[in-house]
């Protein structure tokens, strides 16, 4: 695993936010990774393993996740605030543009940022997310998000997560489940727990603020930039129909890749996902020349 530096920046409200910074050349855009709803920088270890050194890789932790400070006002657990935080980081680091790798919520943030600051996006990957989301997946996520569970050992945590999610990743091995568990949980004095502020669930369960047409406008803002759409074959959040519609809407810019035998979300270790990310980065470099 490549080494990284833990760095911090501050939100407009003064929240101390964390990111992992994997060194790489400064003469091309960095890869900026934004994780999903309950996830953290460790989710993108496969990206760093593959590209650090060749690319600068920045893995952010959204407010209330990982080493980033929780928000006293849970209504601020919203993509508008996450995007403002990310823009502050880009400005702090003097980064003109980046290749955005957004998993689930991170992809929503990427689309929202494109709608206001498209010039900051040199290319993008949307990992199992789109402008329309299947209610089945929303209901599944809502059934567990915000419910803090404590395990007495890593073995208990790993076994429980494997039992609950085996239909999402039916071909994962014990080692796969162990890595997954250690990426999304951490040790506390009370035991093994998820590493996020459980109050993020309050904003997640709030009614949608915009009609679906507005979400498609956000997606369309990515036009003219190299785009990779990843979909887990078993995904209950991004339907095959919507993924195809996305690829057709931005034909010429977008590549759709379906990762077999996984649900929401591909973990970016799959050969199909890694080959697709390679192609995306080549297209980004072609545009830079």
Language-model features and meaning:
Residues 262-272:
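Catalytic histidine-centered segment of alpha/beta-hydrolase-like enzymes
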Residues 152-206:
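Conserved alpha/beta-hydrolase catalytic His-Asp/Glu region
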Residues 15-70:
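Conserved HGGG/HGGXW glycine-rich cap/lid loop of the alpha/beta-hydrolase fold
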Residues 187-248:
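Conserved serine/cysteine hydrolase catalytic core
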Residues 26, 46-49, 59-101:
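Active-site loop/oxyanion-hole signature of alpha/beta-hydrolase fold enzymes
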Residues 250-264:
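Catalytic histidine neighborhood in serine/cysteine hydrolases
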């Amino acid at each position: 695993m490549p080494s990284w530096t833990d760095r911090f920046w501050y939100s407009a409200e003064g929240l101390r936010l964390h990111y992992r910074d994997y060194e790489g050349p400064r003469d091309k855009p960095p890869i900026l990774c934004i994780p999903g709803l309950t996830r953290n920088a460790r989710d993108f270890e496969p990206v760093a393993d593959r590209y650090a050194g060749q690319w600068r890789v920045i893995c952010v932790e959204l407010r209330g996740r990982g080493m980033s400070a929780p928000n006293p006002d849970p209504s601020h657990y919203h993509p508008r605030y996450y995007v403002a935080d990310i823009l502050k980081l880009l400005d702090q680091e003097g980064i003109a543009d980046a290749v955005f790798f957004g998993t689930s919520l991170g992809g929503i943030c990427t689309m929202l940022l494109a709608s206001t600051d498209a010039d900051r996006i040199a290319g993008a990957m949307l990992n199992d997310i789109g402008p329309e989301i299947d209610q089945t997946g929303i209901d599944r996520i809502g059934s567990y998000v915000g419910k803090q569970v404590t395990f007495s050992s890593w073995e208990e945590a790993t076994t429980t997560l494997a039992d609950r999610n085996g239909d999402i990743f039916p071909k994962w091995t014990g080692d796969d489940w162990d890595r997954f568990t250690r990426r999304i949980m951490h040790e506390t004095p009370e035991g093994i727990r998820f590493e996020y502020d459980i109050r993020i669930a309050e904003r997640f369960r709030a009614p949608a603020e915009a009609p679906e047409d507005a979400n498609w406008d956000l997606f369309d803002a990515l036009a003219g930039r190299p785009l990779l759409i990843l979909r887990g074959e078993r995904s209950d959040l991004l339907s095959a129909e919507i993924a195809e519609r996305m690829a057709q809407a931005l034909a010429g810019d977008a590549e759709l890749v379906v990762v077999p035998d996984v649900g929401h979300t591909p973990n970016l270790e799959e050969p199909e996902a890694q080959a697709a990310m390679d192609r995306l980065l080549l297209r980004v470099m072609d545009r830079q020349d």
